[in-house]
From Swiss-Prot:
<comment type="function">
    <text>Chaperone that specifically binds and folds some, but not all, nascent G alpha proteins prior to G protein heterotrimer formation, promoting their stability and activity. Also acts as a guanine nucleotide exchange factor (GEF) for G alpha proteins by stimulating exchange of bound GDP for free GTP. Plays a key role in asymmetric spindle positioning, a step for asymmetric cell division that generates cell diversity during development by activating G(i) alpha protein independently of G-protein coupled receptors. Required during gastrulation and sensory organ precursor (SOP) formation.</text>
</comment>
<feature type="region of interest" description="Disordered">
    <location>
        <begin position="473"/>
        <end position="493"/>
    </location>
</feature>
<dbReference type="GO" id="GO:0055057">
    <property type="term" value="P:neuroblast division"/>
</dbReference>
<dbReference type="GO" id="GO:0050821">
    <property type="term" value="P:protein stabilization"/>
</dbReference>
<keyword id="KW-0966">Cell projection</keyword>
<dbReference type="InterPro" id="IPR016024">
    <property type="entry name" value="ARM-type_fold"/>
</dbReference>
<dbReference type="GO" id="GO:0007163">
    <property type="term" value="P:establishment or maintenance of cell polarity"/>
</dbReference>
<keyword id="KW-0597">Phosphoprotein</keyword>
<feature type="region of interest" description="Disordered">
    <location>
        <begin position="308"/>
        <end position="329"/>
    </location>
</feature>
<dbReference type="GO" id="GO:0005938">
    <property type="term" value="C:cell cortex"/>
</dbReference>
<dbReference type="Pfam" id="PF10165">
    <property type="entry name" value="Ric8"/>
</dbReference>
<protein>
    <recommendedName>
        <fullName>Chaperone Ric-8</fullName>
    </recommendedName>
</protein>
<feature type="modified residue" description="Phosphoserine">
    <location>
        <position position="480"/>
    </location>
</feature>
<dbReference type="GO" id="GO:0001965">
    <property type="term" value="F:G-protein alpha-subunit binding"/>
</dbReference>
<keyword id="KW-0344">Guanine-nucleotide releasing factor</keyword>
<comment type="similarity">
    <text>Belongs to the synembryn family.</text>
</comment>
<feature type="compositionally biased region" description="Basic and acidic residues">
    <location>
        <begin position="308"/>
        <end position="324"/>
    </location>
</feature>
Length: 573
C-alpha cells in the first residue's frame, strides 16, 4: 500500500477510503505471504488505521469493507504473535455482538424463550448482519492463529453470547449462523476449557440438540442450511469427545441426541448429493461418541406393530405353529421398513453409506481410516441390541449358498470385511474383525464358517482362541440362528476350513515321487524354515494353553509337541 493511501486511512478521509480499501482487498484477496508488509512496520500501521475507522461510529457504512481488510491481515500469524492486539480483539467481539458482559444464559431452552417474551430484542438489519458476519470471519482467523486470542474470547464469555444467539427464536441470516458455528467449532477444537464450559456450565449440548431438531423440522433445507448443520455436528462432536457430566445426566442428553440423529439419517439417508453425504458423515462421526446403550434410539417400535401382533395371534390360532424355521427364513415384517417389529431404516442408511464408502475407497484409493467411524457405530449397534444385531447379520452375513469362492473374493459386504482382516491398517482390520465376530455371536466355529480360519487367525491370536475354544463371558440370546442352506449342506464336507471355501480337487505332485524323495524334500523344507527362523524372518510357534502362539526354540519341536497337543484337544472335545 502506498504511503499516501495509508495517511488518508489514518486521517479517516471518508471520500477516499472506499476506493483505497476496494483496491487493497481486490489485489490481496488470496494473499498468504506477508513479507512485504513487515518492512517499515506497514502491517501494524495499516492494522491501527483500519481499527481507527472501525471504532468511529460515524463511519459505520465503511465497516464491512474495513472488516474485509482485517480478515486479510489476520492471515499473518507472525504479525499477530508479535503485536499487542487485545483492544482490537475486543472491538471485533463488540462488532460481532458476542461480548457477553453480564450476560447469563438460562439453563434450558424453555427458560430462554420465557426470557425473550419478557425482554424482546430488536432484530439486526441486513447491513448490521453483514458487519456481524464479517467480524465473525475475522475472529475465526484470529482464534485459529493465536492461543492468546482464544483465551481472550473465553474471558469475554463469547461462548455464552453465541449460544444464546443460536438458541434464540429470532431468525438470523444463514451466513451469520454459519460463522457462529465455525467460531464455536474452532474454540471447542483448540481449547479444552471451551469444551468443558460449553458442556457443563452452559448446558450447551441441550441447546444445540434443540437447535438441530428445529433445523430438521423445516420443510426445505437448502445448501446453506446444510453447511450450518455440518458445522453444528462438528461442534457437538468436539463437546461429546470427552464428556465431563455425570453418567446419568449425560445418558439422558445422549438418548435425546440419538433420537434427533435418527431423524437426520432418515431425512438425508438417500445420499443423493455430496452435501447430503457430508451431513450423514458428520452425524456418523458424532454417533461414535455416543454410548452403545443409547444407540437403541436409532430404531423405534413400528407404529403398526401392535396391530400386526394381534393379526398374527389370530392366524396362529387357526393353524398349527411351526416348530422349526425353514433354512434361511427371515423374520416376518410388519411393514417394508421394519424388521422384527422395529423400524430399521437408520441402520439401512448406515449400511448404504458403508457400501458407497467402500466403492469410493476402491475407485479413488482413499484412506482406509475414512471407513472406521461407520464400522465403529455398527459394532456398537450390534453389541447393544439383539434386534439390531439380527438385522446387521442378515445384511452382512446372509445364509451361505455359493462356497466355491474364498470369503474375501467378491463385492458383498462380507467379502470386503474379510479382505480387511488381513490389512496392515490396524484400526480398520480390528474394527472389521470385531464386527464380524459380534455378528457371529463370538462363536469361533461360526466365524470360521463365514471368513475362513486363515482370515480370522489374527483375531483368534489376539483373543487367545487359536485353539478354537469357546469364548468365555459372552452374553447373547440363546435363540437358534441355524441358517445353513441346502446348497451349503451339500458342499459342507468338501469345504476347507482354512480357506473358507470348497477347494478344487487337483492331482497331488507327491504321487509321482518315491518315499525316499518325499523324505528328502521334507528335510530340505525343515532346513529352509530353520534358516528363516535364524534370520529372524519367521518365528515358528505352537499354541499354548492360553490359546496364544508361543515361539519355538527349534522347528523340530513341532514333531514333539504336535501329537500331544492334538491328543489334548481330542480330550477337550
Amino acid at each position: 500500500m502506498e504511503t499516501e493511501h495509508l495517511k488518508r486511512l489514518e486521517a479517516k478521509e471518508a471520500d477516499h477510503i472506499p476506493a483505497i480499501l476496494d483496491e487493497f482487498n481486490t489485489k490481496n484477496a488470496d494473499l498468504l505471504v506477508f513479507d512485504s508488509f513487515r518492512t517499515d512496520n506497514l502491517w501494524h500501521e495499516l492494522w491501527l488505521a483500519i481499527f481507527g475507522i472501525l471504532d468511529d461510529q460515524r463511519l459505520s457504512h465503511l465497516h464491512t469493507q474495513c472488516l474485509n481488510t482485517v480478515r486479510i491481515l489476520t492471515r499473518d500469524e507472525f504479525s499477530l504473535q508479535t503485536n499487542y492486539i487485545e483492544q482490537e480483539v475486543n472491538t471485533l467481539l463488540k462488532l460481532a455482538r458476542i461480548e457477553a458482559g453480564s450476560l447469563k444464559l438460562p439453563a434450558t431452552p424453555d427458560e430462554l424463550k420465557q426470557e425473550e417474551r419478557e425482554e424482546p430484542q430488536l432484530e439486526p438489519s441486513q447491513a448490521q448482519s453483514e458487519v456481524i458476519a464479517e467480524a465473525l470471519k475475522c475472529l475465526c482467523n484470529l482464534v485459529y492463529q493465536s492461543s492468546d486470542c482464544r483465551r481472550q474470547c473465553l474471558r469475554q464469555h463469547c461462548l455464552d453470547a453465541i449460544l444464546k444467539r443460536v438458541a434464540s427464536s429470532m431468525r438470523h441470516p444463514c451466513a451469520l449462523e454459519y460463522y457462529d458455528m465455525k467460531l464455536l467449532f474452532l474454540l471447542t477444537a483448540l481449547e479444552p476449557a471451551a469444551r468443558s464450559r460449553l458442556q457443563i456450565d452452559l448446558n450447551g449440548l441441550t441447546y444445540m440438540t434443540k437447535w438441530l431438531d428445529d433445523k430438521l423440522g423445516e420443510d426445505s433445507v437448502g445448501e446453506e442450511q446444510l453447511n450450518i448443520i455440518c458445522e453444528l455436528l462438528k461442534v457437538m462432536f468436539n463437546v461429546t469427545s470427552a464428556p465431563d457430566k455425570s453418567p446419568n445426566e449425560y445418558e439422558i442428553q445422549s438418548l435425546h441426541l440419538t433420537g434427533v440423529l435418527r431423524e437426520l439419517l432418515l431425512r438425508f439417508g438417500d445420499l443423493a448429493t455430496e452435501k447430503d453425504r457430508a451431513v450423514v458423515t458428520h452425524a456418523i462421526n458424532l454417533l461414535t461418541n455416543i454410548s452403545g446403550s443409547c444407540l437403541t434410539e436409532l430404531t423405534l417400535r413400528c407404529s403398526n406393530a401392535e396391530l400386526e401382533s394381534h393379526k398374527e395371534r389370530e392366524q396362529d390360532n387357526e393353524k398349527e405353529k411351526d416348530t422349526e424355521a425353514g433354512a434361511g427364513a427371515k423374520p416376518r415384517e410388519c411393514c417394508s421398513q421394519c424388521f422384527e417389529k422395529r423400524n430399521v431404516r437408520s441402520l439401512d442408511v448406515l449400511l448404504r453409506y458403508l457400501r458407497q464408502s467402500l466403492a469410493q475407497q476402491e475407485a479413488e484409493a482413499s484412506s482406509h481410516e475414512l471407513l472406521s467411524p461407520v464400522l465403529t457405530v455398527l459394532v456398537k449397534c450390534a453389541r447393544s441390541d439383539r434386534v439390531m444385531r439380527h438385522y446387521l447379520r442378515q445384511e452382512i452375513l446372509p445364509p451361505l449358498r455359493d462356497v466355491s469362492q474364498r470369503p474375501e473374493v467378491g463385492q458383498e459386504l462380507r467379502n470386503h470385511l474379510c479382505r480387511f482382516l488381513t490389512l496392515p491398517a490396524m484400526i480398520l482390520r480390528d474394527l472389521s474383525a470385531e464386527l464380524l465376530f459380534v455378528l457371529c455371536k463370538e462363536n469361533v466355529g461360526r466365524m470360521i464358517k463365514y471368513t475362513g480360519y486363515g482370515n480370522a487367525a489374527g483375531l483368534f491370536a489376539k483373543r487367545g482362541i487359536l485353539d478354537c475354544r469357546r469364548v468365555e463371558g459372552t452374553d447373547y440370546s440363546s435363540d437358534s440362528e441355524d441358517s445353513d442352506t441346502e446348497e451349503y449342506k451339500q458342499q459342507q464336507q468338501g469345504i476347507n476350513p482354512v480357506l473358507g471355501c470348497v477347494e478344487p480337487r487337483s492331482k497331488s505332485h507327491l504321487d509321482d515321487i518315491s518315499e525316499e524323495q518325499k523324505e528328502y524334500e521334507a528335510m530340505q523344507l525343515v532346513n529352509l524354515i530353520e534358516q528363516l527362523r535364524q534370520g529372524g524372518i519367521v518365528k515358528p510357534a505352537m499354541i499354548d494353553k492360553d490359546g496364544r502362539p508361543q515361539p519355538l526354540e527349534h522347528i523340530l519341536q513341532l514333531q514333539e509337541e504336535l501329537p500331544q497337543q492334538q491328543l489334548d484337544q481330542k480330550r477337550k472335545t
